[in-house]
Amino acid sequence: MNKELESIYQNIANQSELGQTANYDSYYNPKRLYPIPRAPKRQEINLDPNSTTFYGFDCWNHYEVSWLNSKGKPVVAMAVISYDCHSPCIIESKSLKLYFNSLNNSTFPDVETVVQTISKDLSYCIGSEVAVNVYPLSDIPNQTIYAAFDGVCLDKLDIECSVYHVMPDFLSTSSELVEEVLYSDLLKSNCLVTNQPDWGSVQIIYKGKKINHEGLLKYLISFRNHNEFHEQCIERIFADIMRFCQPESLTVYGRYTRRGGLDINPIRSTEPCAFDGQNIRLIRQ
């Protein structure tokens, strides 16, 4: 990371509440939300922030949502939050947790008001429309928990690993043309600011020259001591595969384990992709 980027993210560390002891609000406080611009990290990996050559979204699931109804009785719920990958900013995850905590002792007349409030606040924070669904526990649709992504699991490959900082040079292709769906549960990186571990699974769907599976797995494992936010890691994987393997089409989908009741699930693709049907839940989630 160059010195300019280091300065930007040091300012984030100083101004946000990441890595700091936080005070919890007793009542609704949208000022707890903290945006992080996407552009600096995209410039680092040569991904044009204004490009329309990639698509995708970020999906968050929140399992610890609560507020008071008009009679002061608590309501507990789950929330699904999604927004386009071309939003100017992402939401800093701890700030989102603190924002939701500020709802705990706040009164709302109905679920619709909660949804409207959250959508308005998050949209203002990131400078783009945010879709929000809130499900009281009694209204949550039946949800299948999947043991793994669809596709061929790379993790069964018997490889030696010794590089734990991102090494895209592991990526290579043969001349054989294929369409493949691959996945790994070995994705691990660290928070850019706090160094806390982020655990995830990643699915790679592509068409083009066959990517060497051993090299791809070594590449994914090389994120192990890398410091970046979830969304940035998935974009880096997408950008590196596009650069080093040059597939005709590519989709990279990451699903991370939760922290503070929140899990983050970014998807990036060369093809337009709708959110509907994509928010599957894996066994570690």
From Swiss-Prot:
Q: What is the active site of this protein?
A: 191, 198
Keywords recorded for this protein, A-Z: Cytoplasm, NADP, Oxidoreductase, Queuosine biosynthesis
Q: Which residues bind substrate?
A: 91-93, 230-231
- GO terms, molecular function: preQ1 synthase activity
Which reaction does this chain catalyze?
Answer: 7-aminomethyl-7-carbaguanine + 2 NADP(+) = 7-cyano-7-deazaguanine + 2 NADPH + 3 H(+)
Its pathway?
Answer: tRNA modification; tRNA-queuosine biosynthesis
EC number assigned by the record: 1.7.1.13
The UniProt entry's GO biological process terms, in alphabetical order, are: queuosine biosynthetic process; tRNA modification
Residue positions binding NADPH? 93-94, 259-260
The record, for InterPro entries, names:
GTP-CH-I_C/QueF, NADPH_dep_7-cyano-7-deazaG_red, QueF, QueF_N, QueF_type2
- Its primary localisation, in coarse terms, equals cytoplasm
GO annotation, cellular component aspect: cytoplasm
Intracellular or extracellular location(s): Cytoplasm
PANTHER family, alphabetized = NADPH-DEPENDENT 7-CYANO-7-DEAZAGUANINE REDUCTASE
Its annotated function is as follows: Catalyzes the NADPH-dependent reduction of 7-cyano-7-deazaguanine (preQ0) to 7-aminomethyl-7-deazaguanine (preQ1).
Q: How does it assemble?
A: Homodimer.
Q: Which NCBIfam families match?
A: QueF
Spell out the family assignment given in the record's similarity comment. Answer: Belongs to the GTP cyclohydrolase I family. QueF type 2 subfamily.
Sorted alphabetically, which HAMAP family does this protein's record hold? QueF_type2
Q: What is this protein called?
A: NADPH-dependent 7-cyano-7-deazaguanine reductase
Protein source organism: Legionella pneumophila (strain Corby)
Its lineage opens with:
Bacteria, Pseudomonadati, Pseudomonadota, Gammaproteobacteria, Legionellales
